[in-house]
Swiss-Prot record:
Entry's localization field: Cytoplasm
CDD domains referenced in this protein's UniProt entry, alphabetically: SAHH (cd00401)
Cofactor note: Binds 1 NAD(+) per subunit.
Pathway(s): Amino-acid biosynthesis; L-homocysteine biosynthesis; L-homocysteine from S-adenosyl-L-homocysteine: step 1/1
Name of the coding gene: ahcY
Name this protein carries in UniProt: Adenosylhomocysteinase
Major site of localization recorded for this protein: cytoplasm
Amino acid sequence: MSATTQEKGLNYKVKDLSQAEWGRQEIILAEKEMPGLMALRQEYKGKKPLAGARIAGSLHMTIQTAVLIETLTELGAEVRWSSCNIFSTQDHAAAAIAKAGVPVFAWKGETEEEYWWCIEQTLFFGDKGPNMILDDGGDLTAYVHEKYPKLLSEIRGISEETTTGVKSLYKLLKKGELKVPAFNVNDSVTKSKFDNLYGCRESLADGIKRATDVMLAGKVALVCGFGDVGKGSAASLRNFGARVIVTEIDPICALQASMEGYQVLRVEDIIEQVDIVVTATGNDDIITLEHMKAMKDGAILCNIGHFDTEIQMSRLNSEKGVTKKEIKPQVDKYTFPDGKSIVVLAEGRLVNLGCATGHPSFVMSCSFTNQVLAQIELYNNKYELGVYTLPKHLDEKVAALHLEQLGVRLTKLNQKQADYLGVPLNGPFKPENYRY
């Protein structure tokens, strides 16, 4: 047996259990800002729709995720958890969950080896394996398919949180390698158009400012990618007064960016002039070593896509003559042989979680309410192999659960108006193919 599997079945591994009370107080605060999850607890109180579910979870171990985990357990599930990023864990959140009796394996600053060890620990429920997977980014899903394929026969479904993981699911499906039905939570409107857009609009600038104390007003910023995450990122910087330039491969997204007032160029057109570079593409090698060498002295480089492949960090770290100096955790200055330096945040990983605390609780309530509904749906109903999205009526339900807290009063159709539009009186109000 490997050193990893010899240690399987541990109850938890966190950085500092003494932080549990701090974490618990922040969880209580977050619950007030997460009306969707709290409403599901009330709706299913006593019904336990996840009784018997053994959920292996891999998702950023934050305060907001703690509220998700405790919602799953209140609905009857048994849960084991790891983070999906080596820097994203909030140690007080992990401590609070461990203290509450949920097996959690996560701490900020894991090594790559520790990261995969933590993921493996989510798979051992005594003498049983998981029968559900809740994933963010696809690492847990891929790990089970590659390392523990025997567990797949017991797994009823996978719910995937983010764009990168969804791409991976569709790739597996296309190649005939996906063995379990999955829900694409990311493409729920109340996830992608809220978490990806409005969440990034607040959390990107938060991460950059906490890391560097830089004033964004007047700076020239380059945002690579103008999908939902890129749209939120560009708005985040613009709202603080930065002049934002966008790169895109997609003519539709490029046209959207231009009509929002952003200049759309190629990286090589502008890299020498920008003060801040943010990657938000979900792709590889967006910022190359050559780009980094061409950047202004003191420029800031960061990523808000799921993985660290968007910036060529391995080439930067191995380049002869380049020196690295840690300014503080997750803030590193790289100096080139010509004397110029750049500041790289979170080692090229998610800057909003590596250098700050991620998205606000309210918008994560939208995302995580989708996750809970997907888990209930997959656990209680048998799906054929495929990748599915939540039906429109559940998407609208997620939105509705968050309106009262914002003081929203919905207009109600009468029957004549509903008939005229050709929609049910109480929704869904849009066809499945409607683009918000």
